[in-house]
UniProtKB/Swiss-Prot annotation:
One of its GO terms (biological process) is plasma membrane organization. May function as adapter protein. Involved in the formation of clusters of actin bundles. Plays a role in the reorganization of the actin cytoskeleton in response to bacterial infection. The modification Phosphothreonine is found at residues 248, 257, 411. This is BAR/IMD domain-containing adapter protein 2-like 1. Interacts with RAC1. Binds to F-actin. Interacts with FASLG. GO terms for molecular function: actin binding; proline-rich region binding. The gene is Baiap2l1. Residues 306-329, 449-514 are annotated as: Disordered. The IMD domain is predicted to have a helical structure. It may induce actin bundling and filopodia formation. Residues 486-514 are annotated as: Binds F-actin. Residues 471-481 have a biased composition (Polar residues).
Length: 514
């Protein structure tokens, strides 16, 4: 595409103007954007450093876990790797500032002055050449007018030829000047774009090297990192062995473990040195399913009829409420014994196990050590201090061992063994047994109560002890003493259920009491 000198001249001037009015201002804007880019990258590096410091802290937490130790080490390694990559990125952006931002700032200020001067010089030289050409053309016109109308035509003809050559020469010069000026302007523009591209290529080379290093580093570590987290349900073999040991312990608690007394928590706060169930559970048989035998002297002050009524009411209350009888009995036991730091008991009646291997045999006055502090349906589990035999025995056949009787300092026992009132009755050597006439009176009263519709007194087999106590009369203890749970065991008045019957004295001088 051919262009005239004027069009090429306009192209040259426009090229210079584009560099001054668009390229250089664009460089200034690029410098500002580059500085913002630097700030953003530096902020990103600082934020990344803080972030991966947090990752490392979480990794340290994971190293303390028995199943996540390896994952914790991986998190720490990921943190250190990314911080190293961020440090390398920071070094590359220092080169970005040095090679691009700094150079552009320096070149832009100088180039504005240079391009302005170059354009002015080109325009001035171009104007001078045009002026010379125009003068030569004007002289040529004058010569031609003179040669056409003058007498010395040959003389003017020779001068005309000289001016034509001068105009032609000056036209060639100005065309050459315009062409060279256009070429120079375009090259100046290209040099500036080349400079910008070259600087960014240099920075891109640094970034490429950074990414190559990062890729090589990550490719060497990433598969191992992924392997540690591929299965979240995998548990180390050591931990699995520990879990299996927990699932299948050496011993399991006995299914017939007595229910704890409501006072057990209070007792635990007072004494912590009694034996626990788990210590003896492997050798402990289940508690007997039948209710424990009742002490022969437990109901000696109760009227049989009223005792039967009281027993029936108690049983009905237990059935209605649906509570555990052992829990009710534990509540009814005197609280003073719960608070005593005892673990040994003394037998007040003999007991024979017979063919039942789960029961414990002992004689009167033997010392037993409680292995289970709680009571189950009137049964306690303990060890004979002399024979070292273990088994279940009725709690009513024992009493707490007094401090002056113990050989060593007793340990706390939260078990409600028996009411103090019962222990006092059985501990005294001189127990007053009602005379036969009193028994007959009781029998008559019981017979009259039966006729009146009173509840039937439990049979002797229900409350008879396995072994008859010494010095016992022919009358059955259970027939004389009534039910197994007298009211005075719950802390009430022991004579609250005793009724005064009409009595006639043999002394005629005494008044008749009705």
């Amino acid at each position: 595409m051919s262009r005239g000198p004027e069009e090429v001249n306009r192209l040259t001037e426009n090229t210079y103007r584009n560099v001054m009015e668009q390229f250089n201002p664009g460089l200034r804007n690029l410098i500002n954007l580059g500085k913002n880019y630097e700030k953003a990258v530096n902020a990103m590096i600082l934020a990344g450093k803080a972030y991966y410091d947090g990752v490392a802290k979480i990794g340290e937490i994971a190293t303390g876990s028995p199943v996540s130790t390896e994952l914790g080490h991986v998190l720490i390694e990921i943190s250190s790797t990314h911080k190293k990559l961020n440090e390398t990125l920071d070094e590359n952006f220092k080169k970005f500032h040095k090679d691009i931002i700094h150079e552009l700032e320096k070149k832009t200020e100088l180039d504005v002055k240079y391009m302005n001067a170059t354009l002015k010089r080109y325009q001035a030289e171009h104007r001078n050449k045009l002026d010379s050409l125009e003068k030569s053309q004007a002289e040529l016109k004058k010569i031609r007018r003179k040669s056409q109308g003058g007498r010395n035509a040959l003389k003017y003809e020779h001068k005309e030829i000289e001016y034509v050559e001068t105009v032609t020469s000056r036209q060639s010069e100005i065309q050459k000047f315009i062409a060279d000026g256009c070429k120079e302007a375009l090259l100046e523009e290209k040099r500036r774009f080349c400079f910008l591209v070259d600087k960014h290529c240099s920075f891109a080379s640094h970034i490429h090297y950074y990414h190559m290093q990062s890729a090589e580093l990550l490719n060497s570590k990433l598969p191992r990192w992924q392997e540690t987290c591929c299965d979240a349900t995998k548990v180390p073999e050591k931990i699995m062995n520990m879990i299996e040991e927990i699932k299948t312990p050496i011993s399991t608690p006995v299914s017939g473990t007595p229910q704890p007394s409501p006072m057990i928590e209070r007792s635990k706060m007072i004494g912590k040195d009694y034996d626990t169930l788990s210590k003896y559970s492997p050798k402990m048989p289940p508690a007997p399913s039948v209710k424990a035998y009742t002490s022969p002297l437990i109901d000696m002050f109760n009227n049989p009829a009223t005792a039967a009524q009281s027993s029936e009411k108690t049983n009905n209350s237990t059935a209605n409420t649906g509570e555990d009888p052992s829990l009710q009995r534990s509540v009814s036991v005197a609280t003073g014994l719960n608070m005593m730091k005892k673990q040994k008991v003394k037998t007040i009646f003999p007991h024979t196990a017979g063919n039942n291997k789960t029961l414990l045999s002992f004689a009167q006055g033997d010392v037993l050590t409680l292995l289970i502090p709680e009571e189950k349906d009137g049964w306690l589990y303990g060890e004979h201090d002399t024979t070292k035999a273990r088994g279940w025995f009725p709690s009513s056949y024992t009493k707490l061992l007094e401090e002056n009787e113990a050989m060593s300092v007793p340990t706390p026992s939260p078990a409600p063994v028996r009411s103090i009132s019962t222990v006092d009755l059985t501990e005294k050597s001189s127990v007053v047994i009602p005379p036969p006439d009193y028994l007959e009176c009781l029998s008559m009263g019981a017979t009259s109560d039966k006729k009146a519709g009173a509840p039937k007194v439990p049979s002797a087999s229900t409350f008879r002890a396995p072994v008859s106590r010494p010095d016992a009369t022919s009358t059955s203890p259970s027939d004389a003493n009534g039910t197994a749970k007298p009211p005075f065991l719950s802390g009430e008045n022991p004579f609250a259920t005793v009724k005064l019957r009409p009595t006639v004295t043999n002394d005629r001088s005494a008044p008749i009491i009705r």
